[in-house]
Amino acid sequence: MFFQRRLSLVTGGAGFIGTHLAQALLNAGGRVRLAVHQRAPIISDPSVETVHGDLADPQDCLRAMQGVQLVFHAAGAVSGAGGSPEDAMAGIVKNLNLTAQVLHAAWAAKVERILIFSSSTVYPATDHPIREDELYEQPPHPSYLGYGRMRRYFEHLAEFVASRSTVKVALVRPTAVYGPHDDFDPSRSHVVPALVRRAVEKADPFEVWGSGDEMRDFLHVEDFVRGCLLAIEKHAVCDPINIGYGSAVSIRQVVDTILKAAGHDVPPRFDSSKPTTIPVRTVDTSKARRVLGFEPQIPIEAGLSDLVRWYAARTAS
């Protein structure tokens, strides 16, 4: 009932997370407006509004906000582990400007609520599931230093807006989200879409960056967007909340699952000399369970197998 009759703006409406957010909002009875820039939206529902423009431009951003009650800020520049420091800095500049403009426009347009994505990269390195209140004990891991500090700054900006305006802010810290409509471009893709693409293409040798022992908390995108909807409805109090699966698996396990699902019988070749990131990343999700009633529903094996089938069907068509 919460989303019915409310108009939600989804920034990054043609992207991975934005597409799934829009569909989840439609399924919840909500009205949806997509903000898109250079790409056409994937969703073709005739009830969905589309606003074209550059949200880094103050006028375009404010125009997209008019008449909106809820904002889900899913737009942003992304890069993979192999990107250069200069590429990372360019992405940080874009994302800082974009998020500042979105928060400013939401304030000016007097929207009811906005959901801002932080990230589990804000956390320092730990070997245990990290809680929300452990953020500032140390800086982010060196491999996430720029990106993690950028996301920390997003939280500070959101806190300022929430404390000075009538806009209610929800903050989520997602783990590694995967699923259909992710970015499979080799120059930008993260680990799961990169592995899926190469498995479906039957790459041989099948090279994997890192030792394979790196541990990650992977969350299916459908579970993630469900957590986002719960957060903006139940916890728009500018208090960060981890949204993850709650347990980690090794990259080696992920590789084995993907290769099996793709029917690609080849031994993976792990290369520890190539760029990788933090050895272990898992988050404590007890707050999400307690405050939101959030429980992930899609196990990693089922989610990865479904993703391989989806990508194989898409590339075959």
Please name every model-derived segment:
Residues P142-R173, V196-K202:
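Active-site Tyr-X1-5-Lys
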